[in-house]
């Protein structure tokens, strides 16, 4: 009798866990916008399907992962990661020497619960876009927003990635200008999916590096 009771209890617990998992999956699925990017779901055209992210908790629980460029030995990514840390948000620099490693680092970032991923624009080429789409789709499916960091001598018009995969195009420059979106605001407006421009411009001084 005791064994039978124990079996019933195990089955009951298993069913309960399954129900919780299914409900969690359903809630999460609803949190991913249908046609717009995670982290940039509020636009005038998509206001009716806006998905807010008001469960983000404390800033100290947020981590931004920055993927290295293969063209500058990661110097720009390290600069951005340092600036994010100084703004009060945790940041992880993810080194990569080859394109495949960059894509692997994106998946690593998603699987280690990064709240935002910054990818250099020069990682995307006509020949690699198909390969990248798999990783970007994976990040999107997990509700992790992506920011594309503008690379030297490249513009937004050079980016050939569907807009549903990236929340913002971020141009970070070293200069003394004060007309900009701060590092903190650029990251948090995407993490919290607050209304923002598709293109963000941030000026950081040499001292901030």
Labelled PLM ranges:
Residues 27-34:
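Bacterial signal peptide processing site
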Residues 79-93:
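Short helix-loop-beta junction
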Residues 92-101, 123:
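Short beta->alpha junction loops
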Residues 109-117:
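Short acidic/histidine-rich motifs immediately flanking catalytic phosphotransfer sites
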Residues 128-143:
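Catalytic-core regions built around general acid/base machinery
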Residues 148-169:
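Glycine-rich, charge-decorated loop segments at or immediately adjacent to ligand/cofactor-binding or catalytic sites
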Residues 98-110:
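Structural motif
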Residues 176-205:
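A charged, well-structured terminal subsegment
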């Amino acid at each position: 009798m005791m064994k039978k009771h124990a079996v019933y209890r195990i089955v009951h617990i298993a069913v309960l866990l399954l129900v919780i998992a299914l409900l969690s999956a359903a809630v999460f699925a609803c949190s991913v916008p249908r046609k717009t990017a995670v982290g940039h779901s509020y636009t005038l055209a998509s206001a009716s399907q806006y998905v807010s992210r008001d469960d983000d908790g404390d800033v100290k629980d947020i981590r931004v992962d920055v993927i290295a460029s293969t063209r500058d030995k990661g110097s720009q990514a390290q600069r951005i990661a340092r600036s994010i840390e100084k703004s009060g948000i945790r940041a992880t620099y993810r080194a990569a020497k080859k394109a495949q490693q960059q894509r692997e680092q994106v998946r690593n970032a998603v699987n280690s619960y990064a709240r935002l991923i910054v990818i250099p624009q020069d990682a995307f080429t006509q020949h690699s876009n198909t390969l990248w789409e798999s990783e970007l789709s994976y990040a999107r499916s997990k509700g992790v927003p992506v920011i594309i960091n503008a690379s030297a001598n490249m513009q937004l018009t050079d980016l050939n990635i569907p807009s549903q995969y990236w929340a913002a195009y971020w141009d970070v420059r070293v200069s003394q200008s004060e007309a900009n979106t701060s590092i903190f605001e650029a990251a948090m407006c995407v993490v919290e999916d607050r209304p923002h421009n598709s293109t963000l411009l941030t000026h950081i001084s040499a001292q901030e590096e």
